[in-house]
Amino acid sequence: MSPSWRRLAVLMLVAAFLVPAPPAAAAALSDAGFFGRWSAGAWTVGPRLNYAHAGLKPVESAVKAGNYALAKQRLLDYYRARPAIEAGGFSHTTWPGVLELTPSHIWTLGSGEVYVKTLTFGPGEKTVTADVTSSIASGKPGFFLMSRHKDAVIALINSRSKGSGKPTLRLTLADGSVKTLHPTHDTYIWQAHPGSVYGTKYYMQVSDQGLGPFTGETRKAYLGFDLGGVAGVKKAELTLTGTAETAKDIMLYGNAETFDEATRTWTNTVQNTFSWEGDPGGFDWKLPDGADNEYLYQLPRFYFAGPLALEYQKTGNEQHARTLIGLMTDFIKDADVYDADQGAGSYPGNLHAARRLHNWIAAYEILRKSPSLTPEANAAILKTMNRAGLYLQVNVNGTPNKMQSQKITLLHASVYFPEFRVAPAWRTNAADFLSAQLNDSTYADGGYKESTDAYLRGYLRQYVDVVAFMRRNGITFTATAKLRQLSRFLMDQSYPSGYGPAYGDSDSLDLRSTFEKLGELLDDPELLYVGTSGKSGEKPAHTSALYPDTRVAISRSGWTADDSHLRINADRGNHSHPDELAITAYAYGRPLLPDMGTFTYSTDARAKWLRLTTEAHSTIEIDDQPQTSTAAGGISHLITNPAFDVIGANTESSAGARHERSVLSLHSGLWVVSDRLKPVDTVKQHRYEQNWHFAADANPSIRSGTEATTTAFATGANLAIVPADPAEVASTLRDGYYAPRFYAVENAKYASYVKTAPGQTTFDTLLLPSKGAADTSATVERLPVAAAQPYEATALSLNDTAVYYKSWTAKTPRTFGSYTFDGKLLYADAGTIVMVDGSSVERAGATLVKAPAAVKDLAVTFGGDGTVRIDGSGLTASTDPAKAIAIAAPNAAKVILNGKAVPFQREGALIYAAA
C-alpha cells in the first residue's frame, strides 16, 4: 500500500469517530442527523456543525430547545451575514441557450449539439430563416430540430426530397460571393418506430409530448450539408419551410455529426439533447434509454449552476436564483433515495459528486443572500454538501483524475465550511493526498498512468489551480518536483503547435495556456517558453524524448510550429485504445497522421470503431482482431542525434504475431517506417493490415503502380505515403471516421495496405511530408540484400536518390545496391550520411565512412559551401588517422563537430576531424 493510501485509510478510521455513521439505506438526512439531538443535558445524536465556531451559538440554542425550524432560520441568518470565503470557480460559465432552456428542464450533453434559436411554424405553411453563422464557423455542418414544448402539435418540415421549399443554406463568403446549398442528407427519427428509416420522405416530422425525456410521440429531424471546399464563410443563413396546424415552436441546434439518411433510425442515433419540459417532476437525474452513459454522469454535475448563478449575480434577477435553488432541491429530493451511501451527496458517484459539490460551493456563495433561499432549502443544500464531503473523504477510485477531483473539492469544502465539525479532517486528508498522489498517478519516468493527453491536461490544470489555492490559504504542497516532471511529460507529447496529439480518449486541445500557467507556478522557463510559443522563457534544451516505463517515444525536430513531430506508443492504462505501435505525425504546421479521436463513450458503432478497434489507428491490425492490453511490449530504444532519431518498439498484443516497428526520423524532412511481423504459427496464413489515417478534409488518393497514398489539403502541408513492395500489398482507400473533438464525428478516408502471408514478413514505408502539394512522384524500390531476407535485413532505394538500410538481426557486413555497410541502420543521399552502430560504409568499393570501432550514432551533412557537419554521441575532436573517423569529403573547407568548428586533416578524398 502506498503512503498516500495508508494515510487515507488512517483518516477514514479517524473520521468515523467525528460524525455519525451514514444511514444504512437510501434516505434523506434528518434534521437531528445534521443539527444533532440534545436530551437530558447531552448530545444523544452528535451534530455535524461545530457550535463552538463563532456565530453559531443561536443555532445551537434553537437545537437544544428542540426547535429545528428556528435552527434552520438562524443558520440561514448566519450564512447570510458571514463574511465571504473563497469559494472556487465554476466548471462552466455559459453556453448558448443555458439560461433559456435549463428552467424548462432541457439539457444537452457535450458540445456536439449547440442551441441556435427557437423557430415558429404554423398555423399553415411558413418559411423561416435563421442566422447560423456561429454554428458553421465552429465546424458544425449539420442541424437538428426538436420540439420546444411538449404538446400534441406535429410540425412537418420540407425535406430535400420535396419539389419546392426544400431546406437551403445560404453562405456569404469573404470575397462577397454567395453559395447556396441544399442538404446532402436529411431525415427524422421516431421513438414509436425505432427501427424505421425516413430519409426519402417529403417531410421531416418534429413533435414531442408526455412526461419524461421522450415518449412514443417524440420525433426529431436532422439535416447535413457538405461544406467540402467551402472556406471563408462570413455569414450563414438556414431557410426552412414547414407547416403545423397551430403555432409550433421548434428548437434549432447546430450539429457536428455526419450521418446517412438511408440508415439513420431512432435506435442507431446517439442523442445528446433531452427534454423534461412540462413534466412536474422535472429532471429525474437518471439515464434516458439509449443515451450516452455520460448523460447520467454529467447532468448531476450541475454544469448549469455557473451560468445561472453568475447571471443572478450580474442582474439581480431572482428568477435565475429560484431556478437554480429549485434544481438543487429537486435533485436532493430525487437522489436522496437513489444512493444508499450518502444519498444525493454521493449520487451518482466519485467524480460526478465532486464536480457537483465544487459547483454548489461556488453557487452557494452567490445564492446565500438571495431572498429565494428559504431556511428549509438552505438546510437541505447544506446537509447534502456535508454528506458529499463525507463521501469524498472516504471514497476510493483507482483512476487518478477522479481521485484528484475528489480531493480538490474536499479541500475547497474544508476551507469554505469551517463550521462543519469534520472540516479539519477534510483539510488534512485532501492536502496530504494531493501531495502524495502524483507518485501514485505517474510512472518512474514521470509519465502519466492514464493513456490520454486530454485528461492529463485537465489533471495538470487542476493542479495549477489547487496549488495556488493552497498557497493562498496557507496549506503546504510538497510535490512540486513531481508536478514539474509530469508537466514536462505533457510538454514532450504536445505538437510543435502547442496542441495535444489526442491519443487515447482525447480531442486535440490547445495546451499552451496550461503550460504557461504551469511555467509561472513552477518557475519553469521551458514550460513558459512552450506555453507562450517562444515569447517568454527559454527554449527546451532537448527535442526528442523517451519514456520507457510509460512506453512512449517522441521524435521532434524543434519547438516552432513548422517543426516535425512523430509519436509512437505502446502505452496502456485507463482511457487507452488498442493502438500499440501507432504513429501520429505532424509537420509544417499540420497533423498529417492524427489520432482519429473518440466521439463519445456510447455504444454508437462509430464510437466503438474509434475507441475499440486497432483498425482505427495508424498501426498494423493482425488477423482482423483488435489488440489486447496485457501482452508484452514496449519501446526498446530511442537513439537521438541533432540530425535524426531512430525509435524501436515492439508488441505482442495481437495473439497471432509479434509486431516490431522501427522509425528513422530525419529532421531534414522524412520518416521511414519499417515493420516486421513474426507469427507464432509460421505455416498459417496471417492477414496483416497496415493503416494510415487522415483528417476528414485530407482528400487522399492512391496512385496506381506505386500504390502511394497522397493527401490533398486545400492549403498547407501534405503527406505522401509510399510502400516498398506495391505489388505485394492490396492497397485501398477505406471509409472510416474522424472525431476532431468529443461529440463530433466526420466521415474520413484512410489508406489500407494488406498482406496475407505465412511466416515472417515486413512492411517498409516512406512518409514524405511537404510544405505544399504532396510529392506524387515519390518512389520506393526494394534493394536485394546479399544473403538476407527482408525480415533479416531490409534495403530501399528512395526516389533513386537515397538509400536506406535496416538490419533486424545481428549486425554483419552486408551489400545492397552499390553499398556495403556493417552496422544496424544506414541512410545516405547526396548530402547526408546517417548511420547507427556501424563502423564502415562503402559505395562502389570506395570508402564513405570508416571508423576504428562502431559508432553509436553518426550524422554527416555536406553543405554546398564546403561545410561538413558531424554530429554524434560522445564524439570529440581528433585529426589522428589512427583514432579518428575517416569521412569522404573531397570538397571540405570547414568542419563543425556537434555544433563547434574543429580542425581537420585531409588524406586524399578523406578527412579526419572526430573520434
Model-inferred region functions:
Residues 133-135, 223-232, 557-559, 666, ...:
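Extracellular and analogous surface-interaction loops
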Residues 506, 602-914:
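CBM-like, beta-strand-rich accessory domains located in the C-terminal region of large
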Residues 99-126, 137-138, 146-227, 244-248, ...:
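Flexible, small-residue-rich N-terminal segments that precede or flank a structured functional core
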Residues 271-274, 280, 287-484:
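Aromatic-lined, polymer-binding surfaces characteristic
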Residues 28-105, 275:
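Extreme N-terminal leader/anchor segments
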Residues 140, 217-220, 229-237, 669-671:
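Extended extracellular/luminal ectodomain segments enriched in beta-structured repeat modules
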Residues 443-594, 756-762, 778-884, 890-892, ...:
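Carbohydrate-active enzyme catalytic cores, enriched for enzymes
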Residues 2-27:
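Secretory targeting and sorting signals
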